[in-house]
């Protein structure tokens, strides 16, 4: 049992580190940088499951909250979480949760896509509140231009996680 817990903690730590590193791959655009964070969040959920995925994502958010520059473009601190794009970071929690739910491939992919929509909705709401735009206008700025790319990343993350699970036994 102890050996299995060490293995779980190792995977959780590695996933937090991977999220922190790959979050830095960001192409600046007008309001929201283009990133591959949707891929990483989905991969963590699909690979670690609900409990460990939530632990990993919570650890990532807490690291950023205390100022470690783990968020996109080497950002960290409370100001990032309460900024225009902070809602997306909070949206990682339902996103990783839904990706972590067990089931057959079509169900898991569908849940991952619902999780992505929950993440985008959190981002849209926070952006709309801070910018005083309508939800629709905020969606046009921070969500809709990236949605197809992010959906493809979620589907890709599912298949990568399945390969990883087979290789790491």
Predicted regions and their residues:
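Juxtamembrane helix-entry segments on the extracytoplasmic side of multipass membrane proteins
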Residues: 36-37, 81-82, 134-140
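Central hydrophobic cores of alpha-helical transmembrane segments
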Residues: 54-66, 110-115
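Hydrophobic transmembrane alpha-helices
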Residues: 1-54
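Short helix-perturbing small/polar motifs within transmembrane alpha-helices
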Residues: 10-14, 21, 78-121
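Membrane-helix interface segments
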Residues: 5, 50-55, 104-109, 134-135
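Alpha-helical membrane-inserting segments
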Residues: 18, 22, 26, 44, ...
């Amino acid at each position: 049992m102890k050996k299995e817990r060490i293995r779980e903690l190792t995977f959780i730590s590695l996933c937090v580190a991977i999220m922190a590193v790959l979050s830095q791959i960001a192409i600046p655009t007008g309001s929201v940088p283009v990133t591959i964070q949707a891929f990483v969040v989905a991969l963590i959920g699909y690979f670690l499951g609900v409990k460990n995925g939530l632990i990993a994502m919570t650890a990532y958010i807490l690291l950023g909250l205390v100022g470690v520059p783990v968020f996109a473009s080497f950002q960290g601190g409370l100001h990032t979480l309460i900024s225009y794009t902070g809602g997306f970071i909070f949206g990682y929690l339902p996103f990783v949760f839904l990706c972590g739910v067990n089931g057959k491939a079509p169900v898991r992919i569908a849940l991952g896509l619902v999780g992505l929509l929950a993440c985008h909705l959190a981002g849209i709401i926070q952006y709309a509140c801070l910018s005083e735009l309508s939800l629709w206008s905020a969606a046009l700025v921070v969500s809709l231009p990236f949605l197809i790319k992010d959906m493809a990343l979620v589907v890709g993350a599912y298949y990568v996680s399945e390969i990883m699970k087979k290789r790491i036994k």
